[in-house]
Curated annotation (Swiss-Prot):
One of its GO terms (biological process) is response to oxidative stress. Ca(2+) binds at residues 168, 220, 222, 224, 226. Its cofactor is heme b; Ca(2+). This is Alpha-dioxygenase PIOX. Gene3D superfamilies: Haem peroxidase domain superfamily, animal type (1.10.640.10). Heme b binds at residues 172, 392, 489, 493. The keyword Heme applies. It catalyses: a 1,2-saturated fatty acid + O2 = a (2R)-2-hydroperoxy fatty acid; (9Z,12Z,15Z)-octadecatrienoate + O2 = (R)-2-hydroperoxy-(9Z,12Z,15Z)-octadecatrienoate; (9Z,12Z)-octadecadienoate + O2 = (2R,9Z,12Z)-2-hydroperoxyoctadecadienoate. The record marks 269 as: Transition state stabilizer. Keywords: Calcium, Dioxygenase, Fatty acid biosynthesis, Fatty acid metabolism, Heme, Iron, Lipid biosynthesis, Lipid metabolism, Metal-binding, Oxidoreductase, Oxylipin biosynthesis, Peroxidase, Plant defense. The gene is PIOX. It is an enzyme of class 1 (oxidoreductase).
Length: 643
């Protein structure tokens, strides 16, 4: 009987095998019936390269189908999962210092020093760590020749913001063993460093049969504001005043400096003036929440004020990222609708504000769902997520300081006073310069300057001779070539190279360089570095070379990781789902989050003159002298992208 069924199944599926790309035959066989149907739809649309040209509603259906597939097949646990151990959420109605006890079924999920997960199985490259030479790749394909920016779409605040998020989410524990990379003779004369030393990523046995070793995250991957609060009790103690629930902040609105000359903040490693300005802004936000809560609820203890204010501030950060930063990064109507649906659901803000969370995640959004959803895989951020967030091309060579004493011109533009090299704005020297520049001038200058584009030949050369820091912000003695190091890190951490990565994300792989780009110079240089073997192409290089979707500042390959992981950061966290309520946040706290829609709202709260005098754009993340978004009378879901 089973033989007959198999024959019948093969008969039915054989026409499909001709349609489905050969690399997906095996996984298609293993899929459930629903997943098979969704895959066929997604695969057809991919073959036609159509999804981003579809009407908004159809585009959302495609993204929903693709996200479902990734939730089924691209969430892989690393390490053991406790069985039969459960904590009571009522015992921890607040975000803990080290991220523990968020998940009642797995107290360590999302905590400091938990494992990075995976979106696909690791691809061991330990015998190919230097093939091709990372310094050759960095020199011939990454190093900036002429600065290319993002036009009016994305500014330096947006570039600083993503580092602010990375310092909340991810950092790898390093080994004590050093490795040295030496420049190959063919590129040595073009490398700022002829060789450099760095610490390898520490490999830890997982005690699990499928993925035997993994890497630990020294930051808490929950969206818990750890860039300002820290990822453990020791750092948290340093940043708190223990008065009215507040955090330390200097009188000039910047981060406090300790007796050793280092900034006091939740994360002080590899910082720069743009990042610490945002850290300072959200310390102000936390402290303002404390004031509002104390006024509303004078009976609250100091610890409760801190706990509620942390919940509120973390949620504001998550909301700004979801419906403001990401919308500017992926500037299309489809993603405007998609990101707002993540927070508010398809029924929208007005409906949710009036009736509360109605329906499941699709209609009501992830925020306020009845219970968190992790699809049977403990929450973590992943190695692949880390890899697609390699975005140092966003940084220019110089910050253009604006004259805030001048009368603003058309579109609130401001004249330049001078340019300051980015090297002078990183680390301790950067903090000294920031204190001279001041918060307002720094923020306005970043607002008016476009950031770099995520393209080939746009990686800052000054970052190829960089002083890295320890976790406590102390400079290390050995300079590094960050461009070459990033290529090495992906290989060292067994992250698939570009083509295998695409297969892992159910994207059609390339078969020749011309599938990736039309640019003849890029095609020739790829051939020079990688030969004819497209399988050798490094992920970071492939994403930079890839033809971008109109309106996207990132590659489609990176975006599909975002698609699953951005949703996961909200839906797997009980403080955005079952505990997103007045009891946990307080009524005033929840109202604070629900009435904050953008970074502009946060700036307005603390520096109303900044946006009023100097910001013309709709979003604080687009260049400030750009034209505001015009009103579109066509309802969002019925819009059609320009073809």
């Amino acid at each position: 009987m089973s033989l007959v069924m198999d024959s019948l199944k093969n008969l039915l599926l054989s026409p499909l095998r001709g349609f489905i790309h050969k690399d997906f035959h095996d996984i298609f066989e293993r899929m459930t019936l629903l997943s098979k149907l969704l895959f066929l739809i997604v695969h057809l649309v991919d073959k036609l390269n159509l999804w981003h040209r579809l009407p908004v509603l159809l585009g959302l259906l495609y993204l929903g189908a693709r996200r479902h597939l990734h939730q089924e097949y691209n969430l892989i646990n690393v390490g053991k999962t406790p069985i039969g151990v459960r904590s009571n959420p009522a015992d921890h109605p607040y975000r803990t210092a080290d991220g523990k006890y968020n998940d009642p079924f797995n107290e360590g999920a999302g905590s400091e020093l938990s494992f990075f997960g995976r979106n696909m199985l690791p691809v061991d490259q330990h015998n190919q760590l230097k093939k091709p030479d990372p310094m050759v790749v960095a020199t011939k394909l990454l190093a900036r020749r002429n600065f290319v920016d993002t036009g009016k779409q994305f500014n330096m605040i947006a570039a600083s913001w993503i580092q602010f998020m990375i310092h909340d989410w991810i950092d790898h524990l390093e080994d004590t063993k050093q490795i040295e990379l030496k420049a190959a003779e063919e590129v040595a004369s073009q490398c700022p460093l002829k060789s450099f030393k760095f610490f390898k990523t520490k490999e830890i046995p997982t005690g699990f049969y499928e993925i035997k070793t993994g890497h630990l995250n020294t930051r808490t991957p929950w969206w818990d504001g750890s860039a300002i609060y820290g990822s453990n009790a020791e750092v948290l103690k340093k940043v708190r005043t223990f008065k009215d629930g507040k955090l330390k902040l200097s009188a000039d609105g910047l981060l406090e400096i300790d007796k050793n000359g280092k900034i006091i903040s939740g994360d002080v490693r590899n910082t720069w003036a743009g990042l610490s300005a945002l850290q300072a802004l959200f310390v102000q936000e936390h402290n303002s929440v404390c004031d509002a809560l104390k006024k509303e609820y004078p009976e609250l203890e100091e610890e409760d004020l801190y706990r509620h204010a942390r919940l509120v501030t973390s949620a504001v950060i998550a909301k700004v990222h979801t419906i403001d930063w990401t919308v500017e990064l992926l500037k299309t109507d489809t993603l405007l609708a998609g990101m707002r649906a993540n927070w508010y659901g398809l029924l929208g803000k007005k409906f949710k504000d009036t009736f509360g969370h109605v329906g499941g995640s699709i209609l009501g959004g992830f925020v306020g769902m009845k219970k968190p959803e992790n699809y049977g895989v403990p929450y973590s951020l992943t190695e692949e997520f880390t890899s697609v967030y390699r975005m140092h091309q966003l940084l220019p060579d110089k910050l253009q300081l604006r004259n805030i004493d001048a009368t603003p011109g058309p579109n609130k533009s401001l004249p330049l006073t001078n340019e300051i090299p980015l090297e002078d704005l990183i680390g301790g020297k950067g903090e000294e310069n920031l204190s001279k520049i001041g918060f307002t001038k720094q923020m306005v200058s970043m607002g008016h300057q476009a950031c770099g584009a995520l393209e080939l030949w746009n990686y800052p050369v000054w970052m190829r001779d960089l002083i890295p820091q320890d976790v406590d912000g102390t400079d290390r003695p050995d300079h590094i070539d960050l461009a070459a190091l990033e290529i090495y890190r992906d290989r060292e951490r067994s992250v698939a190279r570009y083509n295998e990565f695409r297969r892992g994300m159910l994207q059609i792989p390339i078969s020749k360089w011309e599938d990736l780009t039309d640019d003849e110079e890029v095609i020739n240089t790829l051939g020079e570095v990688y030969g004819d073997d497209v399988e050798e192409l490094d992920l970071m290089v492939g994403m930079a070379a890839e033809k971008k979707i109109k309106g996207f500042a990132i590659s489609e390959t990176a975006f599909f990781i975002f698609l699953v992981m951005a949703s996961r950061r909200l839906e797997a966290d009980r403080f955005f789902t079952s505990n997103y309520n007045e009891e946990t946040y307080t009524k005033k706290g929840l109202e604070w989050v629900n009435t904050t829609e953008s970074l502009k709202d946060v700036l307005d709260r603390h520096y109303p003159e900044i946006t009023e005098k100097w910001m013309n754009s709709s979003s604080a993340f687009s260049v400030w002298d750009s034209t505001p978004q015009p009103h579109n009378p066509i309802p969002l879901y019925f819009r059609v992208p320009p073809q």
